[in-house]
Every structure is written in C-alpha cells, then in structure tokens.
UniProtKB/Swiss-Prot annotation:
Region Tubulin-binding domain necessary and sufficient for tubulin-binding, residue ranges: 157-164
Tissue expression remark: Detected in brain, eye and heart. In brain, the different isoforms display different patterns of expression. Expressed in brain and heart (at protein level). Isoform 3 is highly expressed in cardiac myocytes while isoform 1 is the most abundant in brain.
Protein name from the UniProt record: Fibroblast growth factor 13
Keyword Cytoplasm: yes
Modified residues (Phosphoserine): 208
A molecular function (GO) term: growth factor activity
Ranges where the record places region Disordered: 1-36, 213-245
Gene: Fgf13
Lineage: Eukaryota, Metazoa, Chordata, Craniata, Vertebrata
Residue ranges, compositional bias (Polar residues): 215-245
Reported phenotype of the disruption mutant: Conditional knockout mice lacking fgf13 in the cerebral cortex or mice lacking fgf13 in most tissues display similar phenotypes of impaired spatial acquisition and memory. The cued memory and the capacity of novel object recognition are altered. They also display anxiety-related and reduced depression-like behaviors. This is associated with a disorganization of cortical structure and neural circuits. The laminar formation of the neocortex is delayed and the hippocampal development is also affected.
Ranges where the record places region Mediates targeting to the nucleus: 1-62
Record keywords, A-Z: Cell membrane, Cell projection, Cytoplasm, Membrane, Microtubule, Neurogenesis, Nucleus, Phosphoprotein
Length: 245
C-alpha cells in the first residue's frame, strides 16, 4: 500500500512539473532558437500579412514591353536623317550629331514609330504627303517598314497613298539632304532608301495612340508662329522647288 501511495505521489509531482514546464515554454525564450512562442505567433501573423501583400503585388500586370532599337538611318543619298531640337527634319553628313539617333518602336507587324532620341518627337506624314513632327503618337506616325535590295529599308505611310494607283508615300531625302513630300518619293529611287545602323536593343512602353481629331495642327507640332505652314510641314524647312531624287 505504501509503495502504491508513493508511486502515486511521484506521478503527481512529475505531472505537476511537466505542467509547469509547458506553461513556462509559452513565455520563456528557447535557448536554442532565442524566440518565445509569443514572438513566434507574432512572426506568423506578420509573415501572413507580408505574404498576402506580396500576392497582391504579383497580381499587378507589368507594363507592356516592346523590343525595338536605337539606330541611325543612313540615306542612300549620303546623309544621316536627323530630327533637330526645333523639330526640323533633314539630312546631315555629321555622323556624330546626337540628333541622328532614333528610337524605332514596333507598333504592329512590320510597322514602326520613328522617334527622335533627343527630342522625343515622332515623325509623321499628313494627308498631303508633308512630313512633320508630333509630340503625340497618332495614326500619321505609323510607317510601314519594308526591306529593299542590298539591305536598304523604305518607310511608307500606313494610312496615306495614291488613291488611283495605290502607290505608297515614302519618307525620303533629296540630293541636297532636304526632306521630300511623301507622294514625290518613289520606292525604287535612292531618295527612299535608308540603311539602319543599330546601336543597341531597347525596351519601350507601347505608345498611347491619340486620335487625329484630338489635336489641331499647332498641337501636333505644326505650325509654329515663326514659320509658314508649308515650311513646317515640309520637315521644318522651306520647300525646294526641285524635289527630284
């Protein structure tokens, strides 16, 4: 009997000690991990909040990225196409001019936007074939890119062409390095031929397409007070009487 009572007391003491240990573990730091169970609970809550927040961030769709190039456009006439700070479009023989750098941004199948790196202005062609520059990306800023012989490339308006023959209107420079009206440029002549000289590949955000009716000609970069309408629409220079190739 005494042995049984002793055994019972021993069991009770052991159980009491185990209960005390378990209670102590809830608020006493563990020597091996150095964190209390209370701290662990807090960490679990914080980690869940953080995980929830990270899941939210993952749901955000990244900006659409378009792979284009920074390039120079060398005309078969012996000039580099350039877009100057005042919006003038012409040709130059100065290979080091920073205004000869263009962003060629793909905006469709074999369709590009041509944007000056320095000015951030887009090249555009209006319904009369005049070249001008625009702060906003509109349908007139879209050019079809076609590979010609000997790796030369032509750029024609996506929305304007000869009504009867269907012949395209092309970006072109004459022998003096002056910009030409698109409907005066023939695709098989040197005036229309450009040789891209890519410098690097770049990623671009898709340009926001603006409707032409949103802007007046003055809002699209044409004309300015100091110039005539025809002058600015012809690349910012007075039109040449002889626009031959």
């Amino acid at each position: 009997m005494a042995a049984a009572i002793a055994s019972s007391l021993i069991r009770q003491k052991r159980q009491a000690r185990e209960r005390e240990k378990s209670n102590a573990c809830k608020c006493v730091s563990s020597p091996s991990k150095g964190k209390t169970s209370c701290d662990k609970n807090k960490l679990n809550v914080f980690s869940r909040v953080k995980l929830f927040g990270s899941k939210k961030r993952r749901r955000r769709r990244p900006e659409p990225q378009l792979k284009g190039i920074v390039t120079k456009l060398y005309s078969r006439q012996g000039y580099h196409l350039q877009l100057q700070a005042d919006g003038t479009i012409d040709g130059t023989k100065d290979e080091d001019s920073t205004y000869t750098l263009f962003n060629l941004i793909p905006v469709g199948l074999r369709v590009v936007a041509i944007q000056g790196v320095q000015t951030k202005l887009y090249l555009a062609m209006n319904s009369e074939g005049y070249l001008y520059t625009s702060e906003h990306f509109t349908p007139e800023c879209k050019f079809k890119e076609s590979v010609f012989e000997n790796y030369y490339v032509t750029y024609s308006s996506m929305i304007y062409r000869q009504q009867q023959s269907g012949r395209g209107w092309y970006l072109g420079l004459n022998k003096e390095g002056e910009i030409m009206k698109g409907n005066h440029v023939k695709k098989n002549k040197p005036a229309a031929h450009f040789l891209p000289k890519p410098l690097k590949v770049a990623m671009y955000k898709e340009p926001s397409l603006h409707d032409l009716t949103e802007f007046s000609r003055s809002g699209s970069g044409t004309p300015t007070k100091s110039r005539s309408v025809s002058g600015v629409l012809n690349g910012g220079k007075s039109m040449s009487h002889n626009e031959s190739t």
